[in-house]
Amino acid sequence: MTTSSPTTTTIAKAHGRFIRGSVSKVRRVLDQIRGRTYRDALIMLEFMPYRSTGPITKVLRSAVANAEHNLGLDPASLVIAQASADMGPSMKRYRPRAQGRAFAIKKQTCHISIAVAAQTDS
């Protein structure tokens, strides 16, 4: 049995569930902000031309508020440690088509998870 040194990094998390939008479109934005500081990520999200930046910004602000309120961390020193998007349930709708047929439409949802941690000076 090996013992590892305990890590005392404090991480604050936030989750957004059942967000309308496909997982691939949300992941391309999360890949851009992962590992960046909170301020840099907010600036990037503000000027990105994607619709998924709105819910991502909301979840990021919630994670920072959790770090500030629950752990007493300074928002200026926070960095995005983890950012992921998982597939949620699809809402099924039907569109009428020619000759009495029905065409299935899947409205996709996803779950967004963001974790922020205090920046280490190394």
Swiss-Prot record:
InterPro entries in alphabetical order: Ribosomal_uL22, Ribosomal_uL22_bac/chlpt-type, Ribosomal_uL22_bac/org-type, Ribosomal_uL22_CS, Ribosomal_uL22_sf
Cross-referenced PROSITE patterns: RIBOSOMAL_L22
Domain of life according to the entry: Bacteria
Assigned keywords, A-Z: Ribonucleoprotein, Ribosomal protein, RNA-binding, rRNA-binding
Subunit record text: Part of the 50S ribosomal subunit.
Molecular function GO labels: rRNA binding; structural constituent of ribosome
Name of the protein this chain belongs to: Large ribosomal subunit protein uL22
Protein purpose: This protein binds specifically to 23S rRNA; its binding is stimulated by other ribosomal proteins, e.g. L4, L17, and L20. It is important during the early stages of 50S assembly. It makes multiple contacts with different domains of the 23S rRNA in the assembled 50S subunit and ribosome. The globular domain of the protein is located near the polypeptide exit tunnel on the outside of the subunit, while an extended beta-hairpin is found that lines the wall of the exit tunnel in the center of the 70S ribosome.
GO biological process: translation
Organism: Prochlorococcus marinus (strain MIT 9313)
One GO CC annotation: cytosolic large ribosomal subunit
Pfam family, one: Ribosomal_L22
Family the UniProt entry places it in: Belongs to the universal ribosomal protein uL22 family.
Keyword Ribosomal protein: yes
